[in-house]
A protein has these predicted regions:
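Glycine-rich phosphate/adenosyl-contacting loop at the front of the ribokinase-like
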Residues: 2-85, 99, 255-256
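Conserved N-terminal subdomain of the carbohydrate kinase-like
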Residues: 60-141, 159-162
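Conserved beta-alpha-beta core of the PfkB/ribokinase-like small-molecule kinase fold
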Residues: 136, 140-214, 236
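Short gly/ser/thr-rich secondary-structure transition/capping motifs
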Residues: 8-12, 115-122, 172-177
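Structural alpha-helical scaffold elements that stabilize or flank donor/cofactor-binding regions
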Residues: 129-130, 184-185, 221
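Short, conserved phosphate/pyrophosphate- and ester-handling motifs at nucleotide-, phospho-/glycolipid
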Residues: 54, 195, 262
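Conserved phosphate-binding/catalytic region of the ribokinase-like
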Residues: 3-25, 210-278
């Protein structure tokens, strides 16, 4: 398979992946960036964090995004390689993404810089080939703030097999979302995940009343979802399907910060589902 010189791609050939299939193929597409924390910078971006955790739990994980042709871009690709994250990363003439993160009592707030590389992800033939073989694909709303990445993410996600898990991990940041974007994404997804703050935003945005369960079932029926997943921080997490509800309390831990906690949850959830757990 020929690979564009614009693409940094460290993975097996599609033929090798198809032949082995010893591990589920999990794809994350969206923002790849540096979180600029008080303690220093850390590689991040929700879909890429998801891929990392899914890979640690046994998946054949792949990240799809874009970086700038700059030092930060080189460093973040090196970071992916160091952590054995396979990737399809395009180099584009925009700076590598950064996010300023401030922590108050371990809770992060974000200042997300605009006109960066991950606003310009392209639907390469390699990315489409990969999506067609995916057992699960994860995408969010943040990386869809630009028209180009929005069209790319929706196009690539649409190539995932019908029986694959298509996880929409809502990430409502700053002003980078609206009802139209969320609805477009919901029609592509079959699993919807959000935290309790995002739940309240969506309930207001869609003009819904009723209990948490009633709202969850409304989304499931309206958009044909397999499940609705809600995380509530230190309290609990709940998974709703048409037939069942499963709630677990959050284990007590010493919190350093919660950056990426939701992505770790998503990775563990998808791997558990792919292993046949209920």
């Amino acid at each position: 398979m020929s690979i564009s010189t614009k693409v940094v791609f460290n993975r097996k050939t599609m033929e090798q992946v198809t032949e082995s299939r010893r591990k589920p193929i999990v794809v994350g597409i969206g923002e790849l960036l540096w979180d600029m924390l008080p303690s220093g910078k850390k590689a991040g971006g929700a879909p890429i964090n998801f891929v990392y955790h899914a890979s640690c739990l046994g998946a054949e994980g792949y990240a799809i995004s874009a970086v700038g042709d700059d030092e930060l871009g080189k460093e973040i690709v090196d970071e992916l390689d160091k952590n054995h994250i396979q990737h399809l990363i395009e180099k584009v003439p925009y700076p590598t993404g950064t996010v300023q993160v401030e922590l108050r009592e371990g809770i992060p707030t974000y200042t997300i810089h605009e006109r960066v590389a991950w606003d310009h992800i392209s639907p390469t033939s390699d990315a489409i080939d990969l999506a067609e073989k995916a057992d699960a694909i994860c995408f969010g709303t943040l990386a869809q703030r630009s028209r180009q990445s929005r069209e790319t993410i929706q196009a690539i996600s649409s190539f995932a097999p019908k029986d694959a898990y298509r996880l929409l991990d809502i990430n409502l940041r700053q002003r980078y979302y609206d009802k139209e974007l969320i609805e477009e994404s919901l029609y592509l997804a079959n699993v919807l995940k959000m935290n309790d703050e995002e739940f309240n935003v969506l309930r207001d945005l869609f003009g819904l009343n009723g209990t948490e369960r009633e709202v969850a079932l409304w989304f499931i029926e309206k958009y044909g979802l397999r499940m609705f997943v809600l995380t509530a921080g230190s309290s609990h997490s709940t998974i709703y399907t048409r037939e069942e509800i499963s709630t677990l309390p959050t284990p007590e831990v010493m919190v350093a910060d919660t950056v990426g906690a939701g992505d770790a949850f998503s990775g563990a959830l998808i791997i558990s589902l792919l292993k046949g757990k209920s």
